[in-house]
Amino acid sequence: RTVLPDSVKNLPRMEQMKYRAEHYPLPDFTAPVMNGLAARFKWSVTPNYADANHEPVIKGALAMSAKPGEKLKLKYTVTDPDKDALTIKWWQYVSAGTYRGKVTVDDPASANTAFTVPADANPGDTIHLILEATDNGTPQMNRYHRLIITVAE
């Protein structure tokens, strides 16, 4: 849910949509969706599981709570059923959360890293982090895991 500033709430609907697009862009999932569709088509005509590519698997927390300035350890297990090499990337899904500042994790290319809640975050704010895993199979497959961090008092 996007929280619009009061100055935008009273604008006509089209202006509100333009504001959202400019300030809260949606991630572009087009290529991963198309690759997922292509892989599923291949599954339907491939009799052996091992002859097709499958998406990575991510295991770890879905939600955490922490105070402003507190450092959280992010420990996730990321595997690929086909034993393909994986690329890991953490990123902030700004438009899903209520905290509007930019955040980063200590090592965005590692499934095991840390994150410090910004000092200016308010209790009740939510920060949505996405752990994205991409394999090097054909077609490339992605898995997304959302972590919702709620800022505590």
Predicted regions located by residue number:
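A post-motif C-terminal structural segment
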Residues: 1-48
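Proline-centered linker/hinge motifs at extracellular inter-domain junctions
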Residues: 48-64, 86
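Low-complexity "stalk/linker" and mucin-like segments enriched in Ser/Thr/Pro/Ala/Gly
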Residues: 58-60, 92-120
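Short, solvent-exposed loop/linker segments at the N-terminal edge
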Residues: 64-72
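Extracellular acidic, Ser/Thr/Pro-rich low-complexity tracts
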Residues: 77-82, 94-95, 135
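Short, solvent-exposed loop/turn segments at the edges of extracellular beta-sandwich modules
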Residues: 134-140
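Extracellular and select intracellular beta-sandwich modules with Ser/Thr-enriched
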Residues: 140-147
